[in-house]
Amino acid sequence: MATQVTGAGGTTTSFSNTPQANNDVFNLTEDTVVLASGSQTIIVLDVMANDQGGNAKSLFSVDDGISASTATKQYAPIDLTTQDVQATGISAWESIGGGVSIRINNGKVEMDLSGYLAAHGFASLQAMGAGDQINETFTYAIKLGNGTLSWASVSVNIQGTNDGAIITAVPGADTTVVEAGGVANGTLNDPNAHGQLIITDPDVGQDHFQAPPSLQGTYGTFTFNTTTGVWAYTLNQTLADPLTQGQPVTDTLTVKSADGTASYNIVVNITGTNDAPVAIANVNSVKEDTAPNPVSGNVLSNDTDVDNGDTHTVSAVNGSAGNVGNDLVGTYGTLHLNSDGSYSYTLDNGLASVQQLAEGATVTDVFSYT
């Protein structure tokens, strides 16, 4: 038996009382949908894949599934009695509301989501993010080999996913800095670096960066704009002072995409320079006609140098390199200062100026070194 439905034009169409079309539920993600060739917004649905009726069946019509009947409060498939498929195998687009249209194309249903996507700020299905979803329903009818129709409902649920972001560096970044050197960092070099990162993410609203947990590096400080990706770095000369001449080190800032799927290391290359050592005056004492004489010490033992591991030598005494390692006669005695900083001073007790000193009186012999 079959149920007969009379259309508006008086045409009578029979619906099979033995359901051959089966309801479909398509639970998809933006990554598992089948897209129409060349499109990012039209999906293809094989609604007849689970239908009965053999090879003689064909996709006959589609409808929005909204009943014109208010008396029964149930869907009356009157709209499905009109054949949609033309001789080309392709039907006209039919709106099912919300910016979504459907049509038959060679035995499958195409659903155009472009209107819905545009209304929600998505350029394509791939622009949907985690938590975004599309839920649509429609009905369709198949024509069986005996000429009768069978209809079913279709539910389409599409979930957005978190697509991976990509971070790249804009060419031309300055990623090198050089420590200041000389006396008290008086020889300035290049303490600044800068650049920009670009982030791309198909998901709407995800094309920006997380704020880094810290902008402080080992040798300097970064700044970073989470919207534009512009970054800068300033070397802290005090922190860099321990670096030796030519010593290479790096400071790194790791930034992440808003969704955490991508990260990028901003690496600044730092080169150390030679900071001048600081000589500190040395004092020793000797007493007239009393041991010990000579007295000794090392002038380099209390000198300082911020450069780690630097070694120092005496290069001149009283302004002359020739005095290094040789006896140098002073006012009251003789100094012998070696290049390694070791020295001895011998008071000349034979000098009248020494013997004339009263008990407790003091004089000084002063020498300079470089």
Language-model segments: which ranges?
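Extracellular ectodomain surface segments
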Residues: 2-96, 166-215, 278-330
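Acidic, turn/loop-rich segments in luminal/extracellular domains of secretory-pathway
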Residues: 3, 83-160, 184, 215-272, ...
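Long, low-complexity ectodomains and other extracytoplasmic segments of secretory-pathway proteins
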Residues: 14, 156-171, 266-279
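Acidic active-site catalytic centers that drive phospho-/nucleotidyl reactions
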Residues: 51, 144, 163, 201, ...
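Basic, gly/Ser/Thr/Pro-rich low-complexity segments located predominantly at protein N termini
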Residues: 165, 200, 225, 234, ...
